[in-house]
Design a protein with these regions (language model features):
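Conserved catalytic core of the tyrosine transesterase superfamily
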Residues: 1-180
Length: 180
């Protein structure tokens, strides 16, 4: 309504609309045992590594899709997250266990630019987005949950919330967590 009044050149400052109240639900968090079952239930190494990065590094969907081979530093045990939310770069730690899986995956799949390759978009000869699709990431998480027998409403961001919750439970201070 404000936009319409403003675009018509009419005064809109007097207009006070009530804001819509949204339910504030606590995020779903998986137990450590559920995360373990989730990882073990993955049929494809690609999905196991994908979920491992989402949980083990606390990555967002767009961030895991944008991981390039050059962003991984196995010597320093870290992953550079380029242009994450807020267009900020940051480094996140990689566990030795995850690095072992990443090396196996890279040797087997031979990705070129992005760690997780995508599919051609549209018809044959259409545009090609070399990144794995957001829907593909969501599907992999849902399939793993189904196979693991997890009945909670789990989405990609649930793994990020779970990552943060487990770090807090293990004694990491909130300021350090904020920087991850």
């Amino acid at each position: 309504l404000r936009f319409m009044l403003k675009s018509e050149g009419l005064p809109y400052e007097f207009l006070h609309l009530p804001s819509i109240k949204h339910e504030k639900k606590l995020p779903t968090v998986l137990s450590k045992e559920e995360v373990w079952r989730l990882l073990k239930s993955c049929q494809l190494l690609k999905h196991k590594i994908l979920i491992g990065l989402l949980y083990g590094c606390g990555l967002r969907c767009g961030e895991v899709r944008a991981v390039r081979l050059q962003d991984m530093d196995f010597d320093r045990l870290q992953l550079k997250v380029v242009q994450g939310k807020g267009k900020k770069d940051r480094y996140v730690p990689l566990s030795k266990h995850l690095i072992r899986g990443l090396k196996t995956y890279i040797d087997a799949e031979k990705p070129e630019t992005y760690l997780f390759n995508g599919q051609p978009v549209g018809r044959a000869g259409g545009d090609f987005d070399s990144r794995y699709s957001a829907r593909g990431v969501q599907w992999a998480v849902k399939q793993a949950c189904k196979a693991a027998g997890i009945t909670k409403d789990v989405c990609v961001n649930t793994l990020r919330h779970t990552f943060a919750t487990h770090l807090l439970e293990d004694g990491l201070d909130i300021i350090s967590l904020k920087n991850l």
